[in-house]
């Protein structure tokens, strides 16, 4: 069961995950299925051992939900098989596109238009039908705002989720990064207007500042106080407390520091005084 606070599984942290104490604040892990569908050897054996101990959430990198290229049915089938293998009940991916005749190796933004709402929602429904379960879509960080936009970011996110009848995977750091970079929608306005009943999962992470006006969502640093404040605010706006995961992709500190950040998430959840939501 995916609940409470978790930490993203990374191969560099395998030994730390294998030696977790019983009182660790880490209640679940998350992995990108693309990294594991064809992985074998020692790395896979370590992953399997950790996944036997902790519930697993899957978060995709390359579904290209808003793309124009046909959906990758082999990828979807591989994810479904992985969900069955690990008794995993949760999958999310980004509200973006990453294919254009081949992998672009980046998550590129979608124009916030009615046409794109219908296009993306249709593709999400196709994914859900093939997987046999509801998925969630994540608000992404983006660095170019389309002049074609007919609505703001949170209106677009809500519209897609409503038409696709899917969940919302809320990335608190991305809300902050986009607010600073574009100045179009304050974090407070985003959280006030997001479809709270659909928010079923949360990410929190660190970022780097290229300049005071340009933040990069790197997942390579500690979470900053302003982002912690937004997480606390998010919990006040939501009817229940979704599972919340700390993302850290590189530049790893001692594992105890990561556990301390996960423990801080758990503390914020407790202080919110609300029922915990299960991701499914």
UniProtKB/Swiss-Prot annotation:
What transmembrane ranges does the database entry give? none
Which Pfam families does the entry link to? Answer: MbnB_TglH_ChrH (PF05114)
Instruction: List the SUPFAM superfamilies hit by this protein, alphabetically.
Output: Xylose isomerase-like
Domain of life of the native organism = Bacteria
Q: Which InterPro entries match?
A: MbnB/TglH/ChrH (IPR007801), Xyl_isomerase-like_sf (IPR036237)
Q: Which Gene3D superfamilies match?
A: Divalent-metal-dependent TIM barrel enzymes (3.20.20.150)
Q: Which family does it belong to?
A: Belongs to the UPF0276 family.
Output this protein's name: UPF0276 protein NGO_1946
């Amino acid at each position: 069961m995916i609940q409470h606070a978790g930490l993203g599984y990374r191969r560099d942290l395998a030994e730390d995950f294998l030696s977790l104490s019983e009182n660790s604040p880490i209640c679940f892990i998350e992995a990108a299925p693309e990294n594991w569908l064809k992985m074998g050897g020692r790395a896979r054996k370590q992953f399997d051992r950790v996944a036997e101990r902790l519930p697993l959430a899957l978060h995709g990198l390359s579904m290209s939900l808003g793309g124009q290229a046909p959906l990758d049915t082999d990828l979807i089938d591989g994810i479904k098989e992985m969900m069955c293998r690990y008794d995993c009940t949760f999958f999310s991916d980004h509200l973006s596109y990453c294919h254009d005749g081949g992998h672009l190796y980046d998550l590129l933004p979608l124009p916030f238009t009615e046409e794109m709402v219908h296009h993306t929602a249709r593709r999400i429904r196709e994914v859900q039908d093939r997987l046999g379960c509801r998925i969630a879509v994540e608000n992404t960080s983006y660095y170019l705002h389309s002049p074609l936009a007919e609505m703001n970011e949170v209106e677009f996110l809500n519209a897609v989720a409503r038409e696709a009848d899917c969940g919302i995977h809320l990335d608190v750091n991305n809300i902050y990064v986009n607010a600073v970079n574009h100045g179009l929608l304050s974090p407070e306005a985003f959280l006030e207007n997001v479809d709270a009943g659909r928010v079923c999962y949360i990410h929190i992470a660190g970022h780097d500042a290229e300049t005071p006006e340009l933040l990069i969502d790197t997942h390579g640093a500690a979470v900053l106080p302003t982002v912690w404040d937004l997480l606390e605010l998010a919990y006040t706006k939501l009817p229940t407390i979704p599972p919340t995961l700390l993302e850290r992709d590189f530049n790893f500190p001692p594992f105890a520091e990561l556990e301390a950040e996960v423990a801080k998430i758990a503390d914020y959840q407790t202080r919110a005084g609300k029922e915990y939501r299960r991701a499914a």
